[in-house]
UniProtKB/Swiss-Prot annotation:
Pfam families: S-AdoMet_synt_C, S-AdoMet_synt_M, S-AdoMet_synt_N. Residues 98-108 are annotated as: Flexible loop. L-methionine binds at residues 55, 98, 247, 278. This is S-adenosylmethionine synthase. Pathway: Amino-acid biosynthesis; S-adenosyl-L-methionine biosynthesis; S-adenosyl-L-methionine from L-methionine: step 1/1. Keywords: ATP-binding, Cytoplasm, Magnesium, Metal-binding, Nucleotide-binding, One-carbon metabolism, Potassium, Transferase. It comes from Clostridium botulinum (strain Kyoto / Type A2). GO terms for biological process: one-carbon metabolic process; S-adenosylmethionine biosynthetic process. The gene is metK. One of its GO terms (cellular component) is cytoplasm. InterPro entries: ADOMET_SYNTHASE_CS, S-AdoMet_synt_C, S-AdoMet_synt_central, S-AdoMet_synt_N, S-AdoMet_synthetase, S-AdoMet_synthetase_sfam.
């Protein structure tokens, strides 16, 4: 049976991704000085303006406007002709402390109040909600091919802009990849869409030629392309006005880009700007860690795990697994292995993945999962042998 599946990615200069990176830059700066700081930082950008808001409880001081300008400069918006300039944009901040009602549930979990606890039971989940983790062995990164390929193309767009290969490119851009599957396995790429911001002096014909030569051919294995593969490069014909001048942006608007490109489910909670007591982030990272190690151990070819939490309660209220018919054992048996090998209380996740560190801005663009260019703890295959003992 054949089917097509499509996923998209965006570059670091996309307005929503600018916001994610600013929010995580603030988080990293606080965790660097105060590992126990509580952060929920949201950012909005529009023409000539950045607004940073949220709830932050910390003992340290960070210069938020300076962080904002440094982040925007690093992305590449460093001159007025780009329509957004790190030096001249206004930066507005509105920061409150974390609600005492939320803090009391995180500081002392329900298990602690009832006296049924060890030390890790003392940290309650920062919110209710459900989080999903996913892994598949169809790529070496244990990620679905459509999102993995889209991210690589987006990263390459930024690379050729910054290293001067294509100096007329500007920071904003999007990619989209359609993969054809046969009997559940990726066999070819059916379509590639790339929209990249550019200077007004360049013509579409040159952009199409350069993107095929310096981006697509460098990233996509030739065996996945054929004479029927379709290419759509700047299909509107012109993309000069971009970034916050073209569209306003908000933190948390690219949650599917951040995860599995729609191939796996999403619980709805965004990641960026949130410290690890927020299970939206830490439990989603843990779920990916669990799923990847299970697939690498040979438990299934494809696996999705759902975790669910109640605010102020340490232990997950539910854990469920779906192997889509690829499991080497029942889903119930896999859940039993998960409970034996992994401790999924928020305090244990923070400990085991060492999450109270400034490691978040680096994943705020080009995906939080499947990253081989950086070392992030939830991508480590450190539980495979222990899982195999229970198979």
């Amino acid at each position: 049976m054949r089917k097509l599946f499509t996923s998209e990615s965006v570059t670091e200069g996309h307005p929503d991704k600018i916001c994610d990176q600013i929010s995580d830059a603030v988080l990293d700066a606080i965790l660097d000085k105060d590992p126990n700081g509580r952060v929920a930082c949201e950012t909005a950008v529009t023409t000539g303006m950045v607004m940073v808001m949220g709830e932050i409880s910390t003992k340290c001081y960070v210069d938020i406007p300076k962080l904002v300008r440094e982040t925007i400069r690093g992305i590449g918006y460093d001159r007025a002709k780009y329509g957004f300039d790190c030096e001249t944009c206004s930066v507005i901040t509105s920061i409150d402390e974390q609600s005492v009602d939320i803090a009391m549930g995180v500081d002392e979990a329900l298990e602690s109040k009832k006296g049924e606890m060890d030390k890790l039971d003392a940290v309650g989940a920062g919110d209710q909600g459900m989080m999903f983790g996913f892994a598949t062995n169809e790529t070496k990164e244990y990620m679905p091919m459509p999102i993995e390929m889209a991210h690589k193309l987006s990263r390459r767009l930024s690379e050729v802009r910054k290293n001067g290969t294509l100096p007329y490119l500007r920071p904003d851009g999007k990619t989209q990849v359609t993969v054809e599957y046969e009997n559940g396995k990726p066999v070819r790429i059916d379509a590639i869409v790339i929209s990249t911001q550019h200077g007004p002096e360049i013509y579409l014909e040159q952009i199409e030629k350069d993107i095929k030569e310096h981006v697509i051919k460098v990233i996509v294995p030739s065996e996945l392309l054929d004479e029927n593969t379709k290419y759509f490069i700047n299909p509107t014909g012109r993309f000069v006005v971009g970034g916050p001048q073209g569209d306003s942006g908000l933190t948390g608007r690219k949650i599917i880009v951040d995860t599995y490109g729609g191939y796996g489910r999403h619980g709805g909670g965004a990641f960026s700007g949130k410290d690890p007591t927020k299970v939206d982030r830490s439990a989603a990272y843990a779920a990916r860690w669990v799923a990847k190690n299970l697939v690498a151990a040979g438990v299934a070819d494809k696996l999705e795990i759902q975790l669910a939490y109640a605010i102020g309660v340490a232990k997950p209220v539910s854990i469920s697994v779906d192997t889509f018919g690829t499991g080497k054992m029942t889903d119930e048996e896999i859940v039993s292995i998960v409970n034996k090998v992994f401790d999924l209380r928020p305090g244990a996740i923070i400990r085991d993945l060492d999450l109270r560190r400034p490691i978040y801005k680096q994943v705020a663009a080009y995906g939080h999962f499947g990253r081989t260019d950086i070392d992030v703890p939830w991508e480590r295959l450190d539980k495979v042998e222990e899982i195999k003992k229970h198979i």
